[in-house]
């Protein structure tokens, strides 16, 4: 999956009308969606934008199978890959573009989704482990490697929940830790890859 569908409820919950219209007019990079700016009139594009927006509440998705929780053996993505070369701001925050590039380059890293588990089931960054912000401190590091592997957390806040988890890990001696600076909503709006439950 290279980008969420325009009718994806998670996408519609956060995408603005202007962003939807832009996607219709100009297409979406690295996807099969073509540009319709020269194929449709401005009125038709406005009508299509309004229709897609209406799917926020009027679209009934097919039943979904919940994504299975990752096993500890699968926590590290690309375990044989190189460590990513991140630029960390304020000793904590990493630009989402660098994380997306690390995934494309098959770098070694761990990604933590610190939102609620229901949000993780709905949509998450590929390979992300659900470690909700309300997890107890004695369980937060369960199964996580404490070596040179980068551990990257994200939330929707865009910092509060992931900051909490990273603080807990740092107290336990985890050094290569960071938070996706822009948060999950901006990850979606950038059309970066997300996955969720499969339709039955």
For the regions a language model picked out, list residue spans one by one:
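Sec-exported extracytoplasmic/periplasmic mature domains
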Residues: 25-29, 38, 50-60, 104, ...
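Hydrophobic residues at beta-strand termini and immediately following loops
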Residues: 6, 131, 180
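Solvent-exposed, polar/charged alpha-helical surfaces in well-ordered, non-transmembrane soluble domains
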Residues: 4, 18, 22, 46, ...
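Flexible, polar/low-complexity N-terminal or interdomain linker segments that lie immediately upstream
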Residues: 53-110, 119, 200
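Extracytoplasmic/secreted cell-surface and envelope-processing proteins
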Residues: 32, 121-122, 161-163, 187-189
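Catalytic cysteine-centered active loop of the rhodanese-like fold, especially the PTP/DSP P-loop
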Residues: 141-187
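Positively charged, proline/Ser/Thr-rich regional signature most characteristic
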Residues: 86-160
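Extracytoplasmic electron-transfer domains, predominantly the class I c-type cytochrome c fold
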Residues: 2-56
